[in-house]
Regions:
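Hydrophobic alpha-helical membrane-insertion signals
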Residues: 1-24
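Anion-binding and metal-coordination hotspots
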Residues: 4, 48-51, 57, 62, ...
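Basic, short loop/linker segments at the boundary and entry of helix-turn-helix/winged-helix-like folds
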Residues: 17-63, 432
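Short, solvent-exposed loop/turn and secondary-structure capping segments
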Residues: 89-90
Length: 552
């Protein structure tokens, strides 16, 4: 009698079910290369309690989680509990809980930043980042907080003084004890009721919430006073401040809605759209951000000789004057050029916009300043119907600033006079700031090269945000505070760049690079990114994809 032997389980290599072309291997090899080149970042700690979950297993695991839209610590814990093969490989079959994952994110933000910088350096060495043209853009990201849980400056000071005044007297006859009893037991009191009503009218529900928290115990009182101090440190004018995330600023988004947001600035390389630099700011506009971005780019690209392209939102005269003296070239449209482009796009994508305008409004639209073409050679403005505005001899001075004025004497007899001029002047005039530096920047933008560079800005700079929101499924910030938000967005940028690398570089190329680094390490000891400069190599490229690394 033959007995068939049955086996209900078998031991196998956990990675045998993963496809060789999987995105997992891009993450795996990139991290291995990073670890081989930066061993000092993974040295074992010499003091304190030894960590069970070391950064060399946690960093690739967290990055791989972001690649799969698994971001929160709880979701990451539930992910490996489902016995995913990729998690077993990266974690070496260990089982970190959500508290361990959160501890890693808090303690190793510098390691995450170093990995982000390494990805950019790797792109430069392999040709995935050209470094010659950078596109900068910014967007508002909604803070992880409720717009209605907020306080104004006067409400905050009133609440702070109230707590300081009454929290010192905690006897049974004191107001602090009676208020605690009122909120805990909801007992009606003729003495407390009018005070609470007055507080509700003054500090609203948000202030009452903080007051309730401070009444619990000594620890809660200390935490509330610390929260009030943090809110006070982030006061900006008369704008409201969120009590949930005080570092998120009250800004108006592109839809015209007010809310608590962060301003996220990103620089994208022109070659394949990799993010070269990014940071979070609390400012409500982009006007002074170009100089800040230059500092990040200079450090990461290792040079200041490149071109940065931005939109008119970055037009800030003092910043442009400083930038003009630097080796970095800027391509930026002036207000007139930006308005003309916006009108052309509106006409192309929203033709119904002009359907509801009267005949007079349509005629006035034709004679707006941006419809007058500037002839640099003859230094004149040419109107829609051929009218020429010449430059006046005298400069006009307003608030200490000199302006060139262009006008014509033919306005009185012109049939378009009612639509082209204003009633006060009855004459068409165009004023231009008399500034040689600004004129040089404008002419650089109007040149054929400037137009070609700016033409690609939308697909690169704004396309990066579209990729983050659509292809990368980024739906908003899930952390609070500038530091934590910046760490979260660093992981998001790493995810974006690694997917770009996976798209434009074959797995076998990454594997070859890792093998050569290990080989050089055995022969020469410690190595760094300079090893790419010592190699005699070239990449075989086919259809914008690096398919092979050839070493001489």
């Amino acid at each position: 009698m033959n007995i068939e032997r049955q086996c209900y389980w078998k031991c196998s290599d956990p990675n045998q079910n993963i496809q060789e072309l999987s995105l997992f291997y891009t993450v795996y090899y990139l991290f291995r290369i990073f670890k081989e080149l930066n061993p000092r970042l993974f040295k074992r700690q010499l003091m304190g309690r030894p960590r069970i979950y070391t950064p060399d297993i946690m960093l690739p695991f967290v990055c791989w989680g972001h690649m799969n839209d698994i971001i929160s610590c709880r979701a990451l814990e539930e992910w490996w509990r489902r016995n995913d093969d990729t998690c077993n490989i990266l974690l070496n079959c260990r089982k970190p809980g959500k508290s361990s994952i959160n501890e890693f994110l808090n303690d190793y933000s510098e390691l995450i930043d170093a990995f982000d910088i390494f990805i950019v350096e790797f792109g430069l060495k392999t040709g995935l980042i050209s470094g010659d043209i950078q596109y900068e853009d910014g967007t508002f990201l909604k803070g992880y907080c409720n717009n209605f849980k907020r306080l104004y400056k006067n409400q905050l000071y009133y609440l702070k003084d109230f707590i300081i005044q009454h929290s010192n007297d905690r006897t049974c006859d004191g107001l602090w004890f009676k208020m605690k009893k009122y909120f805990e037991n909801e007992e009606y009191s003729d003495e407390i009721e009018p005070i609470i009503k007055d507080l509700k009218k003054t500090v609203y529900a948000s202030g009452i919430y903080l007051l309730k928290q401070s009444l619990k115990n000594e620890t809660s009182l200390s935490e509330v006073m610390g929260r009030i101090q943090l809110i006070e440190d982030n006061i900006k004018g008369n704008n409201p401040i969120s009590i949930v995330d005080p570092e998120a600023c009250n800004m108006k988004d592109k839809n015209g809605d007010w809310g608590f947001h962060y301003n996220y600035q990103v620089a994208v390389d022109r070659e394949f759209g990799l993010i070269t630099a990014h940071y979070i700011t609390q400012k409500s506009n982009d006007r002074q951000e170009v100089l800040v971005m230059l500092e990040y780019l200079n450090e990461r690209l290792g040079t200041d000789e490149y071109t940065i392209c931005v939109d008119n939102g970055y037009w800030h005269i003092e910043s442009l004057h400083k930038l003009h003296s630097l080796p970095t070239e800027i391509i930026i449209p002036d207000t007139a050029s930006a308005s003309k482009t916006k009108a052309e796009l509106r006409k192309e994508y929203n033709p119904n916009y002009y359907m509801y305008m009267t005949a007079e409004e349509l005629e006035r639209e034709k004679f707006k300043n941006y419809n007058f073409f500037y002839d640099e050679e003859n230094d004149v403005f040419i109107g829609p119907y051929g009218c020429i505005l010449t430059r006046n001899e005298n400069l006009r001075v307003r608030e200490g600033i000199k302006y060139r004025v262009y006008s014509t004497n033919e306005c009185k007899n012109c049939p378009h006079n009612p639509f082209c001029t204003t009633k006060s002047k009855n004459k068409k005039e165009i004023s231009v700031r008399d500034d040689g530096i600004l004129e040089d920047i404008k002419s650089r933008y109007r040149s054929s090269r400037g137009q070609q560079i700016y033409k690609n800005r939308g697909s690169h700079a704004e396309g990066a945000f579209a990729s983050l929101r659509e292809s990368r499924n980024f739906r908003g910030i899930k952390t609070r505070g500038v530091k934590r938000v910046n760490d979260e967005l660093t992981l998001t940028a790493i995810t974006h760049n690694m997917k770009k690398i996976h798209k434009h570089m074959k797995i076998n190329v990454l594997e070859t690079i890792l093998k050569e680094i290990k080989k050089a390490k055995k022969e020469h000891g410690l190595v760094d990114m300079k090893i790419f400069d010592n190699w005699k190599y070239k990449f075989m490229i086919r259809d914008d994809v690096i398919v092979e690394l050839v070493l001489d």
